[in-house]
């Protein structure tokens, strides 16, 4: 809707329910149009139109409807969408999804106002992701590589260290060779206060805050604000990527809270629920959010997205991870059994996948042996898991010598390759060298997926001889 539309004012509030209000006599309201509520004491609150039919507009108020008077409050329709002033100055700062500072710093003065709903990318101008992003986490870099412009979610479970992994990736991730032009936009959606405090302290103590822009809503914030959080964060990401030629990693945590907020608002509007009680348009809503990542022809910058979500009851078939998996290009799955062994990060590499990995690794991108080594590590670990199951039935004493070596490999693979400290930043060469160290525990005859030239070049037995 044009921003030249006249401001219309109404005092015909007919219904107040949770964060929603109904205003009668409105025939020209537009979906997502910004509204302003003037309270009886003169203070103002903002909201947006979420439905309009038969002359009745349904609006959701960001700050909630407590204190709104049906007779004394006025509602103004402003004829434009919600806009937030964004700027490079936001790096190193913490904001609400409305662009208000949460770090006791000044308001953003420079920059430009942008509609937080963004503009859809024309598929014909998208470029295919091909550049490797180094996260410093071996299980990701070595086996489920992240590429510039990719959407790669992390599926976590309640109590698993998704927050720590998200903070570590935000601190360490970089595009090799373009470190100075890389930044992180971090959207924390409906998290607890102690979690918000952890992220803030971690970024400040490690110095990572200087290249991170944070947008935070807490668990007790209205659902409408939680829904705005990723939209505002991605609006800043688009500005930095496509206007300032920066490479942006957008981390969205926790998308489960986002979907719960969608469900809460849908229930308030008395919409017919879909699968699991979530609104039928949740797939579309998630797609709109996730598809704001990518590379654009003619633009030097890019947006890479890592949505992080909590699987209710560790159920990967739950609607939220299920729909997320359809839209994104792979998944990184955190595993409770590894966590119980004391492995950090507890990434289940066999359940994890990066669909674009093959196009962003290898000679000239990471290292020439990367593809072969990752294939061999996957295959060996998968066989070791089968042998573990067999050993639980017949006992280790009944296993062959080769099978016992696979068990030793699996133990060392988990302890040395997957496991690392939260402040341990491994470059890709270190990751691959550790991979060779653990795969060398197997007889060379079992290393069948790696070309002989790479075995002669990188296998520890041959390196020592040199």
From Swiss-Prot:
GO-annotated biological processes: proton motive force-driven plasma membrane ATP synthesis
Top-level division of the source organism's lineage: Archaea
GO molecular function, one term: ATP binding
Keyword annotations from UniProtKB, A to Z: ATP synthesis, Cell membrane, Hydrogen ion transport, Ion transport, Membrane, Transport
Topology versus the membrane: Peripheral membrane protein
GO CC entries: plasma membrane
Main subcellular location of this protein, as a coarse class: membrane
InterPro entries: ATP-synt_VA_C, ATPase_a/bsu_AS, ATPase_F1/V1/A1_a/bsu_N, ATPase_F1/V1/A1_a/bsu_nucl-bd, P-loop_NTPase, V-ATPase_su_B/beta
Any Pfam family hit: ATP-synt_ab
Cellular location(s): Cell membrane
Function: Component of the A-type ATP synthase that produces ATP from ADP in the presence of a proton gradient across the membrane. The B chain is a regulatory subunit.
Summary of subunit composition and partner proteins: Has multiple subunits with at least A(3), B(3), C, D, E, F, H, I and proteolipid K(x).
Family to which this protein belongs: Belongs to the ATPase alpha/beta chains family.
Name of this protein: A-type ATP synthase subunit B
Organism: Sulfolobus acidocaldarius (strain ATCC 33909 / DSM 639 / JCM 8929 / NBRC 15157 / NCIMB 11770)
């Amino acid at each position: 809707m044009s921003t030249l539309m006249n401001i219309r004012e109404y005092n015909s509030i007919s219904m107040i329910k949770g964060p929603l209000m109904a205003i009668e006599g409105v025939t020209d309201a537009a979906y997502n149009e910004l509204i302003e509520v003037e309270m009886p004491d003169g203070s103002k609150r903002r909201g947006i139109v979420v439905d309009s039919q038969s002359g009745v507009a349904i609006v959701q108020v960001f700050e909630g409807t407590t204190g709104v008077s049906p007779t004394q409050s006025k509602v103004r329709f402003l004829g434009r969408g919600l806009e937030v002033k964004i700027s490079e100055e936001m790096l190193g700062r913490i904001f609400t999804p409305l662009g208000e500072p949460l770090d006791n710093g000044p308001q953003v003065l420079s920059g430009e106002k942008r509609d937080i709903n963004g503009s859809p990318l024309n598929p014909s101008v998208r470029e295919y992701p091909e550049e490797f992003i180094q996260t410093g986490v071996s299980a990701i870099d070595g086996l489920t590589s992240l590429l510039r412009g990719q959407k790669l979610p992390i599926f976590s479970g309640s109590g698993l260290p998704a927050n720590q992994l998200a903070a570590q990736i935000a601190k360490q991730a970089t595009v090799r060779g373009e470190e100075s032009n890389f930044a992180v936009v971090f959207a924390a959606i409906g998290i607890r206060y102690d979690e918000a405090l952890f992220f803030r302290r971690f970024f400040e103590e490690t110095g990572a805050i200087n290249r991170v822009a944070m947008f935070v809503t807490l668990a007790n914030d209205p659902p409408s604000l939680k829904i705005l959080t990723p939209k505002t964060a991605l609006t800043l990401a688009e500005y930095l990527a496509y206007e300032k030629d920066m490479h942006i990693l957008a981390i969205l945590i926790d998308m489960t809270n986002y979907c719960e907020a969608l469900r809460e608002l849908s229930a308030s509007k008395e919409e017919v629920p879909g699968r699991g009680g979530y609104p039928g348009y949740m797939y579309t809503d998630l797609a709109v959010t996730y598809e704001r990542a990518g590379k654009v022809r003619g633009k030097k910058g890019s947006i890479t997205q890592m949505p992080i979500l909590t699987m209710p009851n560790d159920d990967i078939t739950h609607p939220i991870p299920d729909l997320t998996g359809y839209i994104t290009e792979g998944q990184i799955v955190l595993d409770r059994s590894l966590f119980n062994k004391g492995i950090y990060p507890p990434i289940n590499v066999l359940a994890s996948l990066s669909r674009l990995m093959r196009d962003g690794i290898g000679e000239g991108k990471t290292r020439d042996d990367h593809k072969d080594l990752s294939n061999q590590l996957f295959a060996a670990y998968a066989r070791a898991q089968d042998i573990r199951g067999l050993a639980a039935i017949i006992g280790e004493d009944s296993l062959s010598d080769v099978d016992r070596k696979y068990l030793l490999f699996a133990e060392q693979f988990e302890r040395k390759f997957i496991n690392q400290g939260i402040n341990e930043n491994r470059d890709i060469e270190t990751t691959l060298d550790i991979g060779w160290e653990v795969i060398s525990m197997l007889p060379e005859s079992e290393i069948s997926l790696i070309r002989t030239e790479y075995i002669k070049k990188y296998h520890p037995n041959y390196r020592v001889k040199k």
